[in-house]
From Swiss-Prot:
It holds the Pfam family BTB_2. It catalyses: K(+)(in) = K(+)(out). The modification Phosphoserine is found at S3, S511. Keywords: Cell membrane, Ion channel, Ion transport, Lipoprotein, Membrane, Palmitate, Phosphoprotein, Potassium, Potassium channel, Potassium transport, Transmembrane, Transmembrane helix, Transport, Voltage-gated channel. This is Potassium voltage-gated channel subfamily A member 6. It comes from Homo sapiens. Homotetramer and heterotetramer of potassium channel proteins. Interacts with KCNAB1 and KCNAB2. The gene is KCNA6. Residues 1-33, 210-233, 488-513 are annotated as: Disordered. A lipid is attached at C285 (S-palmitoyl cysteine). Residues 194-262, 317-337, 396-409, 430-436 are extracellular.
Amino acid sequence: MRSEKSLTLAAPGEVRGPEGEQQDAGDFPEAGGGGGCCSSERLVINISGLRFETQLRTLSLFPDTLLGDPGRRVRFFDPLRNEYFFDRNRPSFDAILYYYQSGGRLRRPVNVPLDIFLEEIRFYQLGDEALAAFREDEGCLPEGGEDEKPLPSQPFQRQVWLLFEYPESSGPARGIAIVSVLVILISIVIFCLETLPQFRVDGRGGNNGGVSRVSPVSRGSQEEEEDEDDSYTFHHGITPGEMGTGGSSSLSTLGGSFFTDPFFLVETLCIVWFTFELLVRFSACPSKPAFFRNIMNIIDLVAIFPYFITLGTELVQQQEQQPASGGGGQNGQQAMSLAILRVIRLVRVFRIFKLSRHSKGLQILGKTLQASMRELGLLIFFLFIGVILFSSAVYFAEADDDDSLFPSIPDAFWWAVVTMTTVGYGDMYPMTVGGKIVGSLCAIAGVLTIALPVPVIVSNFNYFYHRETEQEEQGQYTHVTCGQPAPDLRATDNGLGKPDFPEANRERRPSYLPTPHRAYAEKRMLTEV
């Protein structure tokens, strides 16, 4: 049975036992790193003035943590008070201590913000596994380099990478970002303007020596009906079917008109900038595989490849020789080529997503959708069930009506979708009493179906929005960890002696590092790989 010693404080820097003999702090079992201590021995932990008392065997359950490892926690030991002192967040320590008492259950107190509690977890060194489990319980995305910005090792590549990838890094980088945004906007405007009737290449009335443009003058209904035809008339009224007899002069004329078109020239300048930017960023990126895994870089590739496909198609059409016969086959081949080109050029609209590289709002929206994929999947699944159910119900409810607008269940899918989403397009509607009842139930079910997952999506958006705001605010402050003595404490073989404790001098107080202060730093921490 262990006999407890009654200790009395004497002069600063010395501790006396029951017989009055002088003892060093290294004579205490706990202060000496736990050597020879009983597993049921208790110790006191002082968190910013709030004292906690627990057993050593409770902390020893996790020996790889700050409190569980005697060698790590010993530098916070105060021999004058015979306790450990931490100048940390007090409400968070309730959950930290419960982590040891419960054998690994980590729960954040409701009155502690998430970022503060994450900082406390890292300070007490609970480990990456506990941190990952806690983030998963909190609904956070796993950490994996999202806030860590890798940089190339070469100085020149590092400067180029910062210049084109991080607009906030310098003034020239902001200038390049502004130029990139302007080029993106010009490309989108050109994509929209070239579809106007005043500028659209129509190919009718080709008496001007090439492909004519649509006149802005109003035309009669008969000519408007003819405009809906997909046939094209080229140089001097030559139709696509007559190209075989007309030689390649019409194609040359078309090619010359295509390559001298103002829209094509502006588009070419935009593509030159996009290609230059992509190649520079690829040559300076720190990791080539990670470069192609980035969704933004994939969008950049998708934004420029339709131009080169269209350009290659036009060049091939100019160089190939048309046969003297088989005009019908050429007509069908050209119609197929035009259809493919329309689909390819439609991909140009995805250039608008390039703006998300320079917009925090679009990035937050993308992260919200990524984090809400499960809720969005449930929403689509519920809508699918509702569409099948109510389209079948309205079809059979309207089956006896001769004027029914629902000839089949697949035809009623459209009505069910616009009704459940509360759009109410109005092109299809029930006429019978039973059909109207089904329509009412469909609208109510649609409101409930859409309303259920929306709060989760809004919650994710708020989380990412506040996290982005907090990161911007944290970029303006530098946090200095408090509670660690400034000089390095070195443990002796027999424990901790008086020379190892600066608090055992006449000042009676440890020399702590300064409190958190404001530092006007705008940049985030960038790690070099």
